[in-house]
Amino acid sequence: MDAALLLSLLEANCSLALAEELLLDGWGEPPDPEGPYSYCNTTLDQIGTCWPQSAPGALVERPCPEYFNGIKYNTTRNAYRECLENGTWASRVNYSHCEPILDDKQRKYDLHYRIALIINYLGHCVSVVALVAAFLLFLVLRSIRCLRNVIHWNLITTFILRNITWFLLQLIDHEVHEGNEVWCRCVTTIFNYFVVTNFFWMFVEGCYLHTAIVMTYSTEHLRKWLFLFIGWCIPCPIIVAWAVGKLYYENEQCWFGKEPGDLVDYIYQGPIILVLLINFVFLFNIVRILMTKLRASTTSETIQYRKAVKATLVLLPLLGITYMLFFVNPGEDDLSQIVFIYFNSFLQSFQGFFVSVFYCFFNGEVRSALRKRWHRWQDHHALRVPVARAMSIPTSPTRISFHSIKQTAAV
């Protein structure tokens, strides 16, 4: 059935139901359409609530929906919507007073989701602060701008952009989400682009390490423009194809959120899964070569394994392998669901923080460059203080003035 025809039938049913309600409850006659002012027509919102014909300036209340998204709501509470002075309905409907009726299991899950959301906010905030600090360090310390650190810098940039757009998505309220606004779809598209670029820069990190360690190929022959193309340009056609698919096949809910059976999201999730699998192969080869070199050394076996484990743990967030630990929901039982919720929230929100710590704050080149800057600043400050004191103290016969030193030097 045509969507416009279906909507017309629903609105007609809405009008009939409201007319019956008015007659039964004795609400009186609806506003006179021939009156001096325009009025708001009977309409049906995106959630399915019927709003009756109302006078301009009226704040209309309707019972909360009985069911929405499979959740039962308390119908004794009301939703509110304003009929504007120009005879049109306000775009925003106030459903804030509608409360779900939850059983014990749903209440438990609701509590866990709330805690997970707090972990997400905390992790993203901590990550953004650490990432911005790391970004500024790479920006200021020009002496360390080799290809490896430029790759780290770009990866950190994608984390910053991804986290900022994540915060923007959290600001979208339910009405805008259900209304499928254009700007809302644009924010979702930009967010998904930064998600894909983030994973592709993890892939670039893996390519660089695999080339340098496993293939023993000189990194001097690697070209920066090629990595920039992989990290920033290849995700563009992927996201464009996804946006076209969403526009024609799943144009709803701001293009955010995935229902079972929706395949359009795999247009960008497929390449992400592919680069994660390739990075997993890179990690396996890197650790294998590392173990081979450690066995050839004279260190004890315990120290060898400790170094290998340490290197593996450091590489996990850089290559995005942590996402593979809980990429798929493990099951329907309570324990699996709770573990899935908390691990996903922690790993995804704090990954930017771990990347900043391991590859900037613990980076030997960064720390050495910072120490040199600090020593130069101390030396410069130490030289300026005695000179300022010498120029401010009056000279005496027993004290050699700064002016006399200059004259002696001139002679």
Swiss-Prot record:
One of its GO terms (molecular function) is corticotrophin-releasing factor receptor activity. The keyword Kinase does not apply. It holds the Pfam family HRM. Residues 140-146, 215-221, 292-302, 365-411 are cytoplasmic. Glycans are attached at N13, N41, N74, N86, N94. It is found in: Cell membrane. InterPro entries: GPCR_2, GPCR_2-like_7TM, GPCR_2_CRF2_rcpt, GPCR_2_CRF_rcpt, GPCR_2_extracell_dom_sf, GPCR_2_extracellular_dom, GPCR_2_secretin-like, GPCR_2_secretin-like_CS. One of its GO terms (cellular component) is varicosity. Disulfide bonds join C14-C50, C40-C83, C64-C98, C184-C254. PROSITE patterns: G_PROTEIN_RECEP_F2_1 (PS00649), G_PROTEIN_RECEP_F2_2 (PS00650), G_PROTEIN_RECEP_F2_3 (PS50227), G_PROTEIN_RECEP_F2_4 (PS50261). A N-glycosylation site within the signal peptide impedes its proper cleavage and function. Monomer. Interacts (via N-terminal extracellular domain) with CRF, UCN, UCN2 and UCN3. This is Corticotropin-releasing factor receptor 2. It comes from Rattus norvegicus.
